[in-house]
A protein has these predicted regions:
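A conserved structural/catalytic subdomain of Rossmann-like adenosyl-cofactor enzymes
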Residues: 1-222
Length: 222
């Protein structure tokens, strides 16, 4: 479990090419963004078949292309990614950007589904920093436990677990989205605007204008 520096510049890409531990066999991350360097190191140092990784990352890790996109694709194709959990903005010291938790599991076996959670709207606002409440954490944990306990999907299309909060994606979903893990592609949080009753609104405006005229007449008598 780790919270490495977000998009660290000059992380050591020049020496990673000849890494004696072969940690970057999926590709070398860009010199200016070390996010996947930390992820690669963590995964390669866990036990085969049982190792698990939880890492906090900026959202760019979910969708940036080029070498990062290739690394992300290989991690997914190897069935290592288990969950993508979106967090609220302004949660960490030193940055106000929203972050996500990536869960990797080297023991997923035949289950290729990936859980997406949008927890970005559940938090307690603070003067300088937001915080996750106990109930917000429990919501995330319970969604993850339910995902783990459920039977893997047999269809190519994923399924909504909780409306506007969590989604169980299949590998077909991921491929359809070109391995882009941006959470809104999977969790639909769109809120429809309430339908406006035009006639009722017009009647209210007429009534308010009448009241305004009556007040104006009263004021003229003073």
């Amino acid at each position: 479990v780790a919270n490495p520096p977000f998009s660290l510049d000059k992380w050591g890409a020049d020496t990673a090419v000849a890494d004696q531990h072969n940690r970057f066999h999926r590709g070398v991350p860009p010199k200016s963004k070390g996010d996947y360097a930390f992820i690669s190191h963590m995964i390669e140092t866990t036990y085969e078949d049982v190792g698990k990784v939880g890492v906090i990352v900026p959202h760019g890790v979910l969708f940036r292309s080029s070498s990062e996109g290739q690394i992300r694709k290989k991690l997914i194709d190897e069935n290592l990614l288990e969950a993508v959990i979106g967090l609220p903005a302004n949660l960490f010291f030193g940055t106000g950007i929203p972050a996500a938790i990536l869960i990797f599991n080297r023991g997923k076996e035949a289950n290729k589904d990936i859980l997406f959670i949008d927890g970005s709207r559940e938090f307690e606002s603070g003067k300088n920093q937001n915080k996750l409440r106990d109930k917000d954490i429990e919501h995330i944990v319970s969604a993850f436990k339910a995902f783990k306990a459920a039977t893997p999907l047999t269809s190519e299309k994923g399924a909504v677990i909780e409306d506007k909060y969590s989604y169980r994606a299949t590998i077909a979903d991921i491929i359809e989205n070109d391995y882009n893990l941006n959470i809104p592609r999977y969790v639909d949080t769109f809120e429809e605007e309430a339908e406006v009753d035009i006639k009722a609104t017009q009647a209210t405006i007429v009534d308010l204008n009448k009241q305004l005229s009556a007040v104006g007449i009263q004021m003229e008598n003073y």
